[in-house]
Amino acid sequence: GHRAVVIQRTEAEPMLSNTMVENSPVHCTSVGKAILAYQPAEIVDRVIDAGLQRYTESTITDPEALRAELTRTRERGFAIDEGEHQPGLRCVGAPIRNQAGHVFAGISVSAPAWQLPLTEVDKLNQVVIYHANLISQRLGYVRS
């Protein structure tokens, strides 16, 4: 589909909301791009054909730019959202694989960009990838 379903979202501040289910666009969120990057080309084409809605000035709306971003995501093993869905928010997401090795979910961490400078993304992506791999293994995925 064209959206990623967020099952749990917890804010750092206890007084802020704790979202249980939320639909998020796959083309401009780190968790969405982490999932979309590993889908067949037909799925990516369907997302593009449905329209790449602009949410912020940073949203990727060009089909070729999205394809290039998905390629970078696969090469890195994680996705980055640089305020593409919500202004000023930086997010790092990694794919979760099922027993057959297919990416069907993702996990991400988000923070205001001023609290998560680009220099810290390399450290955070390692943590996110580690936990995505751990979840994948618990679901029966065995890396070859």
What label would you give each PLM region?
Residues 42-54, 129-144:
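Cysteine/selenocysteine-centered motifs that mediate thiol-based redox chemistry or coordinate metal-sulfur cofactors
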Residues 61-132:
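Extended hydrophobic
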Residues 33-37, 71, 133, 137:
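Generic alpha-helical structural context detector
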Residues 55-56, 87:
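Intrinsically disordered, low-complexity polar/acidic regions
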Residues 1-50:
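Amphipathic alpha-helical effector-binding/dimerization core
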Residues 34, 56, 111:
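Short, flexible active-site loop motifs that bind/organize anionic cofactors or intermediates
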Residues 23, 27, 36, 58-65, ...:
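Alpha-helix N-cap/loop-to-helix boundary motif
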